[in-house]
Amino acid sequence: SQSLDVKEATGKLDWNESGLAALARADLGTAGRVDARLNSPDPPRFGLPDRGDFRLSADRLDAALFNPILTDALSLTGSLSGTAAGKLLPRSQLDAAGEVRLSGGVLSLKDEKAHVTVQAEKAQLRWAWRDKTLNGDLDLRLAQHGTLAADFRLPVPARLPAAVDGAGLVQLAVRAEMREKGLLSAVFPGLVQESRGRLDLSGAVSGTWDNPKGNGTLKVGQAGATLPAMGIQVSDVTMEARFEDREIRVTSFRAVSGPGSIEGSGTLRLRDREIHHIEARLSGERFQTVRLPELEMLASPDLTFEGAPKALKVRGSIVIPDLLIRGGEKRAVVRPSKDVVIVGESLEKEKNRPIPVDMEVRVVLGDRAFVKAEGVDARLEGDVLVTASSLDAMKATGEIRL
């Protein structure tokens, strides 16, 4: 719970036939100060007067006071200052403008697995509310993480109580230049380390409130990370995407690991603000997927993805040009005279909310696939067909020979 320590509060209200004069002040100590003023020439009545002017100001208001209205995982600290001033008009209409500034702001996002903290060098919102629209602009600058700017025009008529006009026109423009420095590492501790990258976004929304249409571009560059569980470093990650109305088109994607790389492209179609259909392709040559003491592997995938997220069809092949399996445990090894054949090997795991997928992918071993274990030093060859109806119930059929 958030406590509020009011050091001093004063108020004055004088409403007679000559008009209304009201004034209120509150000193919250270290939590800031609030001042409010309202004047009107109208005589006394129930409710707000039809005419008048008002001004509300806040100075160094503790941003933590607003945490109760945020989600449990989100918290804000810093000092908020701002003003709101305007006129009262007949029929509960308004003509007002103002701004809000955040200084020394720190935004924290915390859940059971991660805690992310971002410091804001500058955060300013300016707005004007008159006639049939609420418009304004946002300027956000994050320490070490880039900038975001937005201009908006929303169909919210300037009257009380406020309500959105669903048939009214919407205009929104967003520009962002963000730098990722360790945020992914904080969100996925242990899984991702030394994450980095740059994101450039330019987007716009038009249409009506009930039927908005978006378009823009997204670029990711200079990105990379270390994946300790796989023992690899992914670098030179780039991506370009365009989004328009109900479609997101990834025109290019590329990532480097070890001696090779992967690249891809695809299209995501949206319905009811969710992904409805996927079409994508991923290919590569000698991409380092694992580099651990017990296992090293390069992969050359050629895969296609098509369908709805809950009925995704995966087809293609993965060539393993380099594979080295090292054995560290001493155990009895039985070697057949000619080869070892694996047929119908089940990869089923414990079922827990299975993710449906229609998979048929052939995995082919290249010329440099070896096993070096206690009592075994041999080359592997062969291929298997991996099929699945869900990601937790895969099956491989074929043969791998020593």
Model feature map: region roles:
Residues S1-L402:
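Interface amphipathic segments
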